[in-house]
Amino acid sequence: MNRRQILRGLVAAALFASLPAFAAIDVAGVKFDDTTTVAGQPLKLNGAGLRTKFVFKVYAAGLYLTEKKTSVAEVLAVPGPRRVAITMLRDVPSEDFGKAFTEGLNANTSKEERNKILPQIMKFGEIFAQTPTLKKGDQLTLDWTPNEGTQCYLNGKKIGEMMPDQAFYNAVLRIWLGDKPVDSSLKPALLGEK
């Protein structure tokens, strides 16, 4: 190798190293950044995937955690803030979305668990009552912040009240990650399986 080739290699390496690392994952045209921030803390994209019903693409979802986890137990136990980011891929009446939420929650929690978080389930249901339709392109975000609670956002704007119990957030996560997930192909995608 001559000096010119070595110099070219060093210049190319320096240019490559200076490029920003935008490792976004694309799910049905929706880009999920590799990192995000919740409550001032950086989170990593644990996984992202597509929610389908029959043959229809309903939404793309991404799960952000403080550190990557591959099992449901680890995800539910991970400390710090968390985020579920959902981008709608079709119009869905909020009544249908709320019904699917309730069915997913009921399928993956016991009656005792639901009774403990019933006030928060009711508040969450009120959120859907405020929005008649989730439209294609809408972004729904569910953030968990320790010592504060769960806050929902629609297109970046807060909707509904803060729901304080972590058991509620974990119950919501189990809609996608529980033993009976709403979409069996979305669960492994959110757990970062390729």
Predicted feature residues:
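Flexible glycine-rich active-site/ligand-binding loops centered on an Asp-His dyad
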Residues: 159-186
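N-terminal signal peptide c-region/cleavage motif recognized by signal peptidases
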Residues: 18-20
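N-terminal export leaders
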Residues: 3-7, 11
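Mid-length scaffold segments of soluble, non-membrane domains
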Residues: 69-147
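N-terminal secretory signal peptides
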Residues: 24-78
